[in-house]
Amino acid sequence: MVGLTGGIASGKSTIANFFSDLNVPIIDTDLIARDILGTKSPALIEIRTTFGDAVICADGSLDRNAMREIIFAEERKRQLLENILHPRIQKEAYQQIAQSIGPYVIVVVPLLYESSMKEAMDRILVVDCQEETQLQRLIERDNETIEQARLIIDAQASRADRLSIADDIIDNEGSIIRNK
């Protein structure tokens, strides 16, 4: 089992897609998180109970922008959300790992440094880039303000922390084609 991690907007999904193109099984915990947050799901009901109707859209789905503003403004609220989501995400990830076929599987875990899942990995692959590159990508990709982008980056493990758990590193500072 290979844990693939990196900071937000570092290029984890792009690198995971390269492996997927080579028929390597990929389990993406961000996708699992989206799946478990379906309308009327137990996780979404617990989030609504904990954070209130302000984080729920008119159609009953999670208002990701409202949730993001809350959790990146206050550490305690981010911890509350993680306590709701992380056990569910990990349970589903381990179920998918057990069902995967092949000599190895890549498990994409953005917050691997902060997660107990790192202990289960045989190797850890960190997708790395400079913080300024992350900021630029995050602002362009998600239309974030520089202030909001910095809050998001600052809420995650530091680059040095991520690199400290790496068995292997992909420098994703340059072009996508170079990494492929």
Predicted regions and their residues:
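Short, acidic/turn-prone active-site loops that include or flank metal/cofactor-
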Residues: L31-R34, C129-E132, D154, I176
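Small-molecule kinase domains that catalyze NTP-dependent phosphoryl transfer to phosphate-bearing small molecules
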Residues: I101, E119-A120, E140-K180
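ATP-dependent small-molecule kinase phosphotransfer cores
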Residues: L31-P103
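Residue-level signal for inorganic ion chemistry
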Residues: G11, D30, L81, I106, ...
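An amphipathic alpha-helix signature
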Residues: L44, R48, E131-Q136, I146, ...
